[in-house]
From Swiss-Prot:
It is found in: Cytoplasm. ATP binds at G30, E31, N32, A33, Q34, G35, K36, T37. This is DNA replication and repair protein RecF. GO terms for molecular function: ATP binding; single-stranded DNA binding. GO terms for cellular component: cytoplasm. The RecF protein is involved in DNA metabolism; it is required for DNA replication and normal SOS inducibility. RecF binds preferentially to single-stranded, linear DNA. It also seems to bind ATP. Gene3D superfamilies: P-loop containing nucleotide triphosphate hydrolases (3.40.50.300), RecF/RecN/SMC, N-terminal domain (1.20.1050.90). InterPro entries: DNA-binding_RecF, DNA-binding_RecF_CS, P-loop_NTPase, RecF/RecN/SMC_N, RecF_2. Keywords: ATP-binding, Cytoplasm, DNA damage, DNA repair, DNA replication, DNA-binding, Nucleotide-binding, SOS response. GO terms for biological process: DNA replication; DNA synthesis involved in DNA repair; double-strand break repair; SOS response. Belongs to the RecF family.
């Protein structure tokens, strides 16, 4: 897939800006707080319907405006599509594809896929379980758009159940029974999908980690569900029964803490290098290698599932990588994936890489083109992939 253009109206610090992407690699050059990351955030919204920076749509709408309008033109193997998201200061979003208003915004998922890599991704290693769950969920939303619907349903049941648990003194336990069943049913659907995604991701990430570490390190990524699958199987009914039994066993603790303690909202991932938990003992260099390996594995997995390469969004990440890791990343992506990369300077880039990139200078929400190589088609991206 290839993103040909973005039109941003009253989005963040962009009042009315059209961006034409005309090369496999686009460098967004500018000082901090000029709008480089905002542009990547717009692409992220089309990919996941979420921002990793804020949770409220009104925070994305330019100050003084009632709404923001984002329009993307994307070329897929099946043809060109126009995607549109309207964000409101007050009220619900509205999404369109090729001029048709979509009844459910989730139906836009899968139209434009991307992998984002920023300095914040180091929290995958050193942060808490929530950071790792969010990363895995964002991947799954693009691999299986139905996953976003499962998450919504699970979140609704979880909130209802927690509201009851907060009334512990006067709670009629019979009210929990139907919610327990729904939580187990939806929770197992989520855990099965997470487990299968990790199974496919692990060999790809392990390969990249060996390559980047010069064959010196072995990466192991282990999914740690809140409820273990019975007898090394992910058969749904047996897993649900085990989750219900665990909920019953934790009833006293849940009533005491007034919150749900069992389910995929308590999952984690264990990341280890050469048998040692990375969060505890990995050096900064090893942590960066690990995250870079996961991101390259994400790219390959999305491409394998969708049959088309996703976009790669690099948000000022080269500053976090030493020269060797930078070179490995740039060699890995080459012209294989359309790449948007933000930076404050060009000195970190190989000159030949800069010469083939489109360079856009970003200043206070305005873009100016510095270099404009010929735009490739989606088919030519596939051709470079096969060569």
């Amino acid at each position: 897939m290839f993103l040909h253009s973005l039109h941003l109206q009253h989005f963040r610090n962009y009042r009315d800006q059209t961006v034409q992407f005309q090369a496999p690699k686009t460098i967004l050059l500018g000082e901090n707080a000029q709008g480089k990351t905002n542009l990547l955030e717009a692409v992220e919204l089309f990919s996941t319907l979420r921002s990793h920076r804020v949770s409220r749509d009104r925070d994305l709408v330019q100050t003084g405006a009632e709404s923001a309008l984002l329009t993307a033109v994307v070329e897929r193997d099946s043809g060109e599509q126009q995607l549109q998201i309207q964000l409101q200061q007050q009220g619900r979003r509205r999404v369109q594809r090729d001029g048709e208003v979509l009844r459910r915004q989730l139906d836009l998922l899968g139209s434009l896929c991307s992998v984002q890599f920023s300095s914040l991704d180091l929290d995958l290693v050193r942060g808490g379980p929530q950071q790792r769950r969010v990363w895995l969920d964002r991947l799954l939303i693009q691999l299986q758009p139905i996953y976003a619907h499962l998450q919504q349903q699970y979140g609704r049941v979880l909130r209802q159940r927690n509201a009851l648990l907060r009334r512990a003194e006067s709670l009629d336990l019979a009210l929990l029974a139907p919610l327990n069943w729904q939580l187990a049913q939806l929770g197992v659907h989520i855990m099965r999908r997470r487990s299968r995604a990790i199974q496919r991701l692990v060999p790809l990430a392990a390969h990249w980690h060996r390559e980047i570490s010069g064959q010196r390190e072995q990466l192991i990524v282990a999914y740690q569900p809140s409820v273990l699958a019975p007898d090394d199987t992910d058969e749904a009914i047996a897993w649900q029964e085990r989750m219900l039994a665990q909920i019953e066993a934790r009833r006293a603790a849940e009533l005491g803490q007034r919150t749900s303690l069992v389910g995929p909202h308590r999952d984690d991932l264990n990341l280890s290098i050469n048998g040692t938990e990375a969060r505890l003992q990995a050096s900064q260099g090893q942590q960066r290698t690990l995250v870079l390996s996961l991101k390259l594995a994400e790219l390959e997995l999305i491409e394998a599932v969708l049959g088309e390469p996703p976009l790669l969004l690099l948000d000022d990440v080269l500053a976090e990588l030493d020269l060797r890791r930078q070179q490995q990343l740039l060699e890995a992506i080459a012209n294989r994936f359309q790449t948007l990369i933000t930076t404050t300077h060009l000195s970190a880039f190989d000159q030949s890489w800069v010469e083939t990139a489109q360079i856009l200078t970003v200043q206070s929400g305005h873009l100016q083109s510095e270099a404009v190589p010929m735009a490739p088609s989606s088919a030519s991206l596939h051709k470079s992939l096969d060569s």
